[in-house]
Amino acid sequence: MRHRYSNRKLNRTTSHRLAMLRNMANSLLKHEVIVTTLPKAKELRRVAEPLITLGKKPSLANRRLAFDRTRDREIVVKLFDVLGARYATRNGGYVRILKYGFRKGDNAPMALVELVDRPEDAVAVEDNSAE
């Protein structure tokens, strides 16, 4: 039975998977749009949305939690100053996943991951980790 299998392993060790998702969440919060594979995008949403929810309540404890999860001061500042204010009235659903075709080398399904209500001048960053 499939019960209690909560996340995808993505063919990586635990430390590699957690580091990869942390780096992808940092890239998403920094650039506000990234391109990656569809399974990675679905796991990324589970990491990024709670971070944005933390940013909506600006307390010292939440800043420390956000820094613990991102390990990047610039991301924490943007999370609490820019993104927290932008999503103050939205109750979840901060990340949009759009199917983006298939990768040329291995035909892997790709996805464009973006923050909703983002400014239109943000440019997509390609994920070249598997190429």
Swiss-Prot record:
Q: Which terms does the UniProt entry file under GO BP?
A: translation
Say which domain of life the source belongs to.
Answer: Bacteria
**Keywords recorded for this protein, A-Z:** Ribonucleoprotein, Ribosomal protein
User: What Gene Ontology cellular component terms go with this record?
Assistant: cytosolic large ribosomal subunit
Any one GO MF term held by the record is: structural constituent of ribosome
Q: Which InterPro entries match?
A: Ribosomal_bL17, Ribosomal_bL17_CS, Ribosomal_bL17_sf
Pfam families recorded? Ribosomal_L17
PANTHER family this protein is in? LARGE RIBOSOMAL SUBUNIT PROTEIN BL17M (PTHR14413:SF16), RIBOSOMAL PROTEIN L17 (PTHR14413)
Against NCBIfam families, the record matches this protein to: L17
Please give the family membership noted in the entry: Belongs to the bacterial ribosomal protein bL17 family.
How this chain assembles, per its entry, is: Part of the 50S ribosomal subunit. Contacts protein L32.
Give the protein's recorded name.
Large ribosomal subunit protein bL17
The gene designation is rplQ
